């Protein structure tokens, strides 16, 4: 009986820790780019809890990243891993696969601003295992 309780408690703790590590995305604005037919600009903030990270993904968009708080680690497929601090920037192109996106700290949160130029109505993030639309 004690072993079952211990297993349940451990599972709850592990699940809570995994859930706490998911990135929090806050949409700030979206605007049709009337002089670029079919495109829109989107602005979001992303917050990583301590130790938080993203799954491997792509944006199928131009993504301009600006670090606001903390320190983040980014890497694109075929590129080098970089650590960014407040005031530093990062760019992802429509064909890039984002293989590393995480908080560099296990004790402090991190927050960054992302401005995307993307196809109107397309999702902001596409998991890497989904095909890129033609």
Walk through the language-model features, giving the residues of each:
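Short, conserved beta-strand element in jelly-roll/cupin
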Residues: 62-74
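Short acidic-glycine-tyrosine-enriched beta hairpin
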Residues: 33, 37, 48, 78-95
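Short structured motifs
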Residues: 27-31, 85, 98-100
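N-terminal targeting signals for Sec/Tat export/insertion, comprising classic cleavable signal peptides
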Residues: 29-62
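A short, N-terminal "cap"/entry segment at the start of jelly-roll beta-barrel domains
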Residues: 2-42, 75, 91, 109, ...
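Ligand-binding loop in jelly-roll beta-barrel domains
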Residues: 81, 96-122
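Histidine-centered metal-chelating micro-motifs
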Residues: 53-55, 73, 90, 94-103
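Extracellular/periplasmic catalytic domains that process cell-envelope and extracellular macromolecules
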Residues: 38, 58, 66, 83, ...
